[in-house]
Design a protein with these regions (language model features):
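Periplasmic-binding protein-like
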Residues: 39, 142-148, 187-211
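Paired acidic/hydrophobic, glycine-rich loop segments that form the ligand-binding mouth/hinge
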Residues: 8-12, 155, 172-177, 192-193
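Mature extracytoplasmic/periplasmic domains
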Residues: 200, 205-244
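Hydrophobic residues within well-ordered alpha-helices
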Residues: 2, 20, 115, 165-169, ...
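Generic alpha-helical structural context detector
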Residues: 113-117, 182, 224, 237
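Short, hydrophobic alpha-helical packing/hinge segments within bilobed ligand-binding/sensory domains
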Residues: 1, 17, 162-165, 181, ...
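A ligand-binding cleft/hinge motif common to bilobed small-molecule-binding domains
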Residues: 16-21, 175-190
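Extracytoplasmic ligand-binding site segments that recognize negatively charged/polar headgroups
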Residues: 11-161
Length: 244
C-alpha cells in the first residue's frame, strides 16, 4: 500500500521498517517536532529497526512478545513449559496427538522462533542471537521448520482467522499475540498463554511517514498523539502490548 501511494503514514512491523527505509519509501523524521519524544523508553529511541546512520525514520508505537497460546481444556492443569508442543510430534495431555492441531505463523519471524528453540535444545550449534544466524544455524532452523510442517494444520497470518480457528476449527496450540489471547479470553473461550522456558521472540511496531506524504503536518500531529499516555496505556491494555 505504501508503494502504491495515497497514504501519509504507516505503522510498520520490525521486519518491514528497514525495507521501507532501504527502498526510500519513508522519510527521515525530525524528532524535535515531536514534543513527547523524550517520554519514549530509551531502549527504543535509537532502535536499529527505525534508526539508520543516526537518522530516525519513525516513532516507536508498541512492542511485545510472541506468546504460546493454548487450549486449557486440552492441557488441563498442565501448563505447557516448552515450545516443543508445536515443534515436535507428541501426545498432548488430553491423550491425543498434536498433529494437525497446532498452528505456526506464516512470516520470517518464525525462522527466529525455530532458531530460539534450537538455541536452547541444541547449544552445540552456537546460536547466540536467533536473529543473527550463520549458514549452518540457518539451515538447522529451516530443517526444524520442515519437520514442523508435518504437524501444522494451518499457517496463520491474520489475527481474526486465528481467533476463528481456535474457536471453531479445533486448533489447540500456536505462537500468537496477546491481542488474540485477550479477545478469546474475553469471549469466554478456554484459552491461556505462556512464555515457555526457551523464551520468546518479539515484535516492535514503528509509525513512519511516507517520503511523499501530502499532509506532513498532520503526520507529525498523529505521531505526537500516539505517544500520549492515555492512548498508550489503553492500547497496551487492549492489545496486550508494552507502551513505548
Amino acid at each position: 500500500l505504501m508503494n502504491e501511494g495515497g497514504f501519509d503514514i504507516v505503522t510498520a512491523s520490525g521486519d518491514a521498517s528497514l525495507r521501507l527505509i532501504a527502498g526510500e519509501t519513508v522519510q527521515e523524521i525530525n524528532i524535535d517536532l515531536i514534543p513527547s519524544w523524550n517520554t519514549i523508553d530509551p531502549r527504543l529511541q535509537d532502535a536499529a529497526w527505525h534508526t539508520v546512520d543516526g537518522k530516525h525514520y519513525g516513532t516507536p508505537y508498541m512492542w511485545g512478545s510472541n506468546v504460546l497460546m493454548y487450549n486449557t481444556e486440552v492441557f488441563g492443569d498442565t501448563t505447557p513449559d516448552s515450545w516443543n508442543v508445536v515443534f515436535e510430534e507428541q501426545n498432548l495431555p488430553d491423550g491425543q496427538s498434536n498433529k494437525n492441531r497446532v498452528q505456526a505463523f506464516d512470516g520470517p519471524i518464525h525462522i527466529a522462533d525455530a532458531a530460539m528453540y534450537l538455541m536452547y535444545h541444541q547449544p552445540e550449534l552456537g546460536i547466540k542471537d536467533p536473529y543473527e544466524l550463520n549458514n549452518d544455524q540457518y539451515q538447522a532452523s529451516l530443517n526444524l521448520l520442515r519437520q514442523q510442517r508435518k504437524l501444522v494444520g494451518r499457517y496463520w497470518h491474520d489475527a481474526f482467522m486465528q481467533i476463528d480457528d481456535f474457536t471453531n476449527e479445533g486448533f489447540v496450540a500456536s505462537a500468537s499475540w496477546p491481542f488474540m489471547v485477550n479477545l478469546l479470553v474475553g469471549a469466554k473461550q478456554p484459552i491461556a498463554s505462556v512464555i515457555p522456558k526457551e523464551g520468546a521472540t518479539g515484535w516492535a511496531d514503528t509509525t513512519m511517514v511516507h517520503s511523499e506524504a501530502a499532509n506532513i503536518n498532520c503526520s507529525y500531529m498523529w505521531m505526537e498523539h500516539q505517544l500520549s499516555s492515555n492512548l498508550q496505556s489503553d492500547l497496551g491494555t487492549w492489545f496486550g502490548a508494552v507502551p513505548s
